[in-house]
Amino acid sequence: MKRIVFLLLLLPIITHARAENFRFAQLSDIHLSPKSTHALEDLKRSIDEIAADTSIAFVIASGDLTEAGDRRCLELLKNELDRLPMPYFVTSGNHETTWSESACTAFDKVFGSSRFAFSWQDCFFIGFNSGPFLKMMDGHVAPQDIEWLKSTLDSLKRVAPDTKIFPVTHYPLQDGDVDNWYDVTDVLRLYNIQAILGGHYHRNLLYSADGIPNVLGRSNLHGKDSVGGYTIIAISPDSIRWSEKVIGKTAVQWLALPFGPKAYPEAVAERPSFAVNETYPEVEERWQKKSGVAILEAPALGKTALFYGDDNGTFYALDRMTGQTVWMYQTGSRIKSAPAVYDGRVVFGSTDGNIYCLSENNGKLLWKVGTGDVVMGCPVISEIAGTLAVLIGGSDHVFRAIELKTGREIWRYTGVDGYVVTRPCVYMGKVIFGAWDCGLYALNLKDGTRAWRWSNGSANDKFSPATVWPVATHGRVFIVAPDRVFTCIDAASGRTIYRTKEHKVRESIGLSADGTTIFSRCMWDTIIAMDARSPKPLTIWKTDGEYGYDHNPSMMIEKDGVIIFGTKNGLLHGVAAKDMRYRGIKVEAGTVLWRHKIGNSVLNTICPVSAYECYVTSTDGSVTHIVINE
């Protein structure tokens, strides 16, 4: 790969040079896929044409370069980009980060990083990932990436304050696209930003990112046309010009903006509202810890500590009462695995390829099992023939049962077609889990042999019941999935009992404490309760949750009669699971008891203590202890 990255120490020489005309190409939304040759053909044509154009100084590729972030396609992409005689720079898009068997680690291994920063004449280009992270959510810029952005631009400003800056993301930095857009624009507004470059919408668009021009370029795909294309951006001493370049045709300019000193003294876009917290003053944030690093999964509760892992691969134990760090353990890569705690031991997977078991008391490593691939699966601990066992799947297409005490493998199942990220369900002598292959698996707990495999029949693996945590009761297994179907399956045979699209569900589900009711959440406001015993779909109640559009896979956890869940934009809910008394008041099932906005980013599946207390982690890097005062 041919790249030029200028060190900040050289910036005074570079940026004080006289600005001259230069042009560069922007490739976006290439969507290479092993299932289609069209995207590769479109890319080859663009690479051939760009390589032959000696006026192009460099190339920027702004995300969705592959369909699913798989290593094979990333390496194929790199091979094509390496044919360019000029340097190129890449960042990732939502198709690299949402559906990634490698937990986004393959991108960094192939390209070095999803970040880049370099100078060209008196301009500075800085690219970074804009999410989402390994599940359905809005785009999100990780807190550690925001800190890197600020640090890099601060260093640049000290040595070359007049440099013209071009941030590069995939998503536009605006409400509805990136949940914490304002955290990013509050940083960018302090500098001489000319325009933010991006893609995502597959067409030429000009947006305002809190007053900063945010320009999106076309997709490289040909779509309904015979050939694809790309964007050419020309910089001159007084203007920036965007042209669409269709393969074999003359470039057509579609936008021009002035080039020169820029200032954005005030925010112009409306910030998220936290007014809902005034409606429910009884909800208290007893403590909150902000780590500055994204947290991608649910925490787990021990005797005196709360446990979770973060995007930097650090595993934490926090004091439950104070939020102070009790101990930390460093793994080799990001953690996207909700831990399990039992008998003084805490178990989790890491994307460094290992399954870890640590002492609950002091974080000492008791054992680890290497898998040879990323582990995003969430473990459960269950008994197999009198032995406590850890049950967990990974990206090596293997599901394992491991002795909790020793780390000895009890059995393994190697027939999983997709990768596993879910927390499995143990029921009727089986361990049940979904994978990113449209399948739901039931393995015999005693020996790991397959009892059955259920499929939704789709050819699109993005409809898989992979993220949902299955629930089971009354001889049935219940799932919801991105196909927006509520499904009931016979636990003994894997036979479909019913599937219904009556409610537009997605990936959030839960089971009542008495096993009679299944809870789920729709993509628009509605919370539902379904009868777990009925031979056909039967809605017991439904209620308006007033959360708007939401596809966050936060499971519907009931504790002491209260369902607690969080949304993609930081809104925590408490809902009555049944007719009950709460805070001394008689309420009906489905009543929204309280709501509380913690931030504007994804809340992971909640860790409840009681109907009045829970712990919440978020992709914004926060851990919050919530108490509802009686």
Model-derived features with residue positions:
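Blade-level signature of beta-propeller repeat domains, shared across WD40, Kelch, NHL, RCC1
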Residues: 598-630
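Extracytoplasmic beta-rich repeat domains
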Residues: 280-300, 327-342, 367-385, 395, ...
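Short loop/turn segments that connect beta-strands within beta-propeller blades
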Residues: 319-323, 359-362, 403-407, 444-448, ...
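Metal-dependent catalytic neighborhoods of phosphoester/phosphodiester hydrolases
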Residues: 37, 62-82, 97-109, 176-184, ...
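His/acidic metal-ligating clusters that form di-metal
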Residues: 49-59, 137-213
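Acidic/histidine-rich helix-loop elements
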Residues: 25-44, 66-68, 96-110, 132-144, ...
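Binuclear metal-dependent phosphoesterase catalytic core
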Residues: 212-276
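N-terminal active-site segment of His-dependent metallophosphoesterases
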Residues: 13-76
